[in-house]
Each structure stands twice: as structure tokens, then as C-alpha cells.
From Swiss-Prot:
Name the UniProt record assigns to this protein: Uncharacterized protein C664.13
Compartment(s): Cytoplasm; Nucleus
GO CC annotation, single: nucleus
Keyword Nucleus: yes
Lineage top rank: taxon: Eukaryota
Keywords of this entry: Cytoplasm, Nucleus
Source organism per UniProt: Schizosaccharomyces pombe (strain 972 / ATCC 24843) (Fission yeast)
Amino acid sequence: MDLEELQKIIQEEQIRCEREIAEAAEARNSSNSLIVVDEYSKESEDVLENGLEHVQSNEFTESEDYKSIERSLAVTEAVMARFEKEMGSLRDQMNFFHQILDNDNLDGFLTGSSKPC
């Protein structure tokens, strides 16, 4: 897997995370609106709307921070998955070379003391 493939995976993960976050925020905002309408009377609507706008603006900031954290997490997970895959490959290569070096015939060949087959 080369750098372009890794970048593509990271972008796909970012898009997926952003979509999930947007869906969750939309669900949260719609449920918040229903609760506000159900719980409070018409007389306090103006006060509540101003308060709700303030809360929603704070939620937007938290949402942006959350998106940033989710993106970083997705990138980190993609990089870690790639790292684990590469480490597995390196482990397999090391085991292969250890097997070759453990072979007495090859060891002698490398030192110049082996006999041809």
C-alpha cells in the first residue's frame, strides 16, 4: 500500500466520520427543539429562543471541536492499522531471514566453509 492509497483511506474515514457526526448533531438538534416546545409556555418563548441560540452556537463550537477530534482519531486509526500491517510484514521477513541463518548449510556458505550440494 503506497502513500496515495493511505491518503484515500484516510479521506474515506474522514468523510464517514463527518457524516456520522452530522447525523448525530441533526438528531440532537431536532430532539432539543421538541423538548423546548413541549416543556415551556408561549410567554417564555422569546427568552428561551435567545438562550437556545446561545446554546446552539456553543454546541456548534463543540461540534467543530468534536469533528476535529474525530478526524484526528480516524487518521490515527488508519495510520496505526497501516503500521500494524507493516510490522506484521517485517516480522514475517525477519522470521524468514532467521530461518535462513539458522540453516547450517547456508551459514557455512556465508562463512565460506560450506560444501556445494
